[in-house]
Amino acid sequence: MSLKIYNTLTGKKEDFAPIKPGEVKIYTCGVTVYDYNHVGHGRSLIVFDMIRRYLRYLGYNVIFVRNFTDVDDKIINRAKNECLPFSVISDKFIKEYFDDAEKFRIEPADIEPRVTTHIPDIINFIQKLVDAGYAYEADGDVYFSVRKFKEYGKLSKRSIDELLAGARIEPGEKKKDPLDFALWKSAKAGEPYWESPWGKGRPGWHTECCAMIFKHLGETIDIHGGGLDLTFPHHENEIAQAEALTGKPFARYWIHNGLVTVNGQKMSKSLGNYIKLKEIYSKYEPDILRLLVLSVHYRSPLDFSWDKMEETKKAYERLKNAIEEAEVLNKLPIDENFEGDLYNAIQKAQSGFYSAMSDDFNTPEALASLFGLVREMNILRDKAIKHGGISKKAIESYKEAAKTLHDIGRDIFGLFDSLQPCIKQEEVKVKEKEESINEDLIQVLIEAREKARKEKQFTIADLIRDKLAEKGIILEDAPFGTKWKKA
């Protein structure tokens, strides 16, 4: 089944075909590091982490770049208010970003460029636009001449006339046309600056990403992503610069995730509904937010509320319990007269999952397939308990179902990182009662139990102890380790 992706540029789903077979180059616009990350940032991070993981699952070598905007008006203003160098502010919030990303198991990008370490590349990029006649200097500022790029507006589906109606030249700006945008800003008193052919200054936001993409990924990439709010003007302006310079498509596929509201309202500090990621993981396991984000299609709006977090927590517990409950069945007597297994349900769930994911990363439908498997697992478990026994085939099928849930959740959705998929046979399997148990195996099981206890997997630890007791081996926990003796 081929992967289909909704392309913002064309407004339709398209078969995914990377430029180089087997390789995918992705760039997503990162955060401007002037404040703590909020739930909107979290959604974008989780969405593109999921996309990256699924592409990798499909066998692609994914080269993923996400930048940091570490010099900007907001950073400079905060630095002034706190009487600190701008770099102290940006360094602080880059560290906060990495802390949040680690908590939510966002895989680090392969390359994470910072604007301030790419100033020569940005200046060189701007100079090429000036030389090509698409940009002009005006008293130390450099602007892009929008009307010279005839396809301007093709991403956001806006015409020049529409844009002109709301455009104006701000006091102090020296651009020739209200539509033109800044590539280089001349230095102001008390602000950071770099030397350039046009004098002291700093780069404009829209040109930074272009220069970093050209440096690290080339002139045409496979996927460019970001939040829906970046479609215009940021991504529109990126296309104009890059394609004016090369005459080639800048990105084959443009992917934008929907925005986040809070209780139906736009998130803002003035409304008091600005939800930081720190606040979320102080109250919930990070997996809960990941699951909430994935329960809504990435292109749809996501309305965040604490009530929805509670609902999602309950759904997460259903998944988690299904994965962990293999030991319940292990405690039942073996009865080969028990009928039923989960192999067909596993196949159906896998097929449904990958079909949904290959249809523009339809995570709600993919999750529905997983919860369908959970339902079948619960039915089998309840039937076996009522029956008072279970066949070996049924137990193994349950373990396989638990492993399927765990591995898909971990590898593609970034869930269950510390969860045991099921009881590993090599950790808990003991010989039949009539056979003796050797000391090497006892020691292996003691070590496995100790590991489970350290990871707070107490159910598994207790099961190992009980299984050894069935063999006549009694464990005695002491401050300096666990000892054993025969009953």
Swiss-Prot record:
Q: Does this UniProt record's set of keywords contain Phosphoprotein?
A: no
Q: Which domain of life is it from?
A: Bacteria
The alphabetical list of record keywords is: Aminoacyl-tRNA synthetase, ATP-binding, Cytoplasm, Ligase, Metal-binding, Nucleotide-binding, Protein biosynthesis, Zinc
Motif 'HIGH' region, residue range(s) on this chain:
31-41
Where is motif 'KMSKS' region found?
266-270
The protein's required cofactor(s) are namely: Zn(2+)
How is its cofactor bound, per UniProt?
Binds 1 zinc ion per subunit.
Its predominant location is: cytoplasm
Any GO molecular function: zinc ion binding
* Pfam hit, one: DALR_2
Q: Which residues bind Zn(2+)?
A: C29, C209, H234, E238
**SMART domains (alphabetical):** DALR_2 (SM00840)
Q: Which GO terms describe its cellular component?
A: cytosol
* Assembly notes: Monomer.
What's the protein name? Answer: Cysteine--tRNA ligase
Q: What is the lineage of its organism?
A: Bacteria, Pseudomonadati, Aquificota, Aquificia, Aquificales
